[in-house]
Amino acid sequence: MQKITYLESPIFIEGYSAVGGREEARGPLGKYFDLTDEKDLFGMKTYERAEGEMSRLALNLALKKRKITEKELDLIVAGDLQNQCVASSGGLFTFGVPFLGLYGACSTCTEGLIVLSAMLTSSRTYKRGACVTSSHNCAAERQFRTPLEYGAQRSPTSGWTATASGAFILSKERTSNIMITSFMPGKAIDGYIKDASNMGAAMALSAFDSIDTFFKENDPDTFDLILTGDLGRVGSAILRDLLSEKNESFGRKLSTLHNDCGLLLYDLSKQDVHAGGSGCGCSASVLSSFILPKVETGELRKVLLLSTGALMNTSSICQGDHILGISPLVTVEYGGT
C-alpha cells in the first residue's frame, strides 16, 4: 500500500543553488542559474570529473548564499547517473561531512529530498543536511549509449541529458519561507517500453500512478503547479492522455496545472534536444534555479514535484528487459504570511 507522509512539523529548504553547462546556459532558464560553464568541463580534464565538480560547486554556492559552513551540516545525501555514484562521492568528499549515496536514476532529486526530510524529522541527531543531485550529458552518453566520437544518430523520442546540478540545504528550524510538507515514495511501474531512447514514454505510467494516488487524498485546487521531472514532450503527452482517460474533467484540471522540467529547461524550437531535457540534474536544476525562488516569494504557494526515473542499465537494455519507471513526489509550499 502506497502511503503519503504528512509532516506535522515541516522541513525547511534553507538554501539552494543551480549549476549548468552550455546548453543549459543557452536555454530559457539560463539566466537563473548561479553558475554555468560554456565548455562543460568546469576546469576538469574529463566529463566524469566535471560532473563531480558541478556537485561541489553547487553545494558550495548554496552554503555561501546562506552564510553556512560545511561544519554546520550533519549529513549529505547525493546521487548522480554514474556507476556507484562516483560523481557525487568524488565531488563532495572534500566537505568532510557524513555521506549517503543515492541512486534513483532521474528521480534522484526527489528521492534525496524524501530521505533527508525523513531523517531530519525522525532523528534527534540530524538538524541540518544537504541534498545534491547531478548529471552530465557527455558522461551519461558514454556510460549508457555510445562514445561521443561515434556520432550515433538520436531518435526523435530521445531526451537530452542535462549537464546540471542542484543543491539544497534542509533544516528542522524555520530558516526560510520554503517548506516541505508531505512526501510519497514512488512504486516501480512497468512502462512496457524496451527502447532506451524513449524513456519519457517508459516513465509516464509511473508518473500517472503517483499523481492518481496522491490526489485521491488531496485537492488539486490547492496546488499552483504539478511538476514532473523529465517526461519531455512524449511522456508529458502520454501522461495527459492517461489522466483524461481516468476522468475527463479531473484530467483536464490536472493538465492545466502540469508542466515538465524537461520542457522548461530548454527551448525545444531552437535547441536540438529532441523530446526535451532528461537526467537527474534536470529536475534538480529547474527546481533550484526557477521554482524555489518563486515559492520563496509566494508567487507559487504550493507545488507538487515528481522527479521521474527510468530504472534500467546497459545490461537490462541489451537483454530486452522492460524499462521500469518510478516517480517519488514531494509537496513544497510557501511558508510566509
Residue ranges and their predicted role:
Residues E24-R26, A87-S89, A140-T146, A237-L239, ...:
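Short acidic, glycine/serine/threonine-rich loops at helix termini
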Residues E14, A78-G79, G129-S135, V303-T308:
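Short beta-strand segments
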Residues E51-K67, V115, A202-E217, V286-P293:
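Short, well-ordered amphipathic alpha-helical segments that serve as non-catalytic structural scaffolds
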Residues V19, A78-Q84, S135-H136, T175, ...:
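Short glycine-enriched loops at secondary-structure junctions
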Residues Y103-V132, L170, S278-E299:
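Active-site-proximal alpha-helical scaffold in enzymes
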Residues I13, E48-C106, D221-A237, L242:
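Conserved beta-ketoacyl condensing-enzyme motif
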Residues M1-E48, P147-E217, R252-L263, S269-D272, ...:
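Condensing-enzyme catalytic core mediating Claisen C-C bond formation in acyl metabolism
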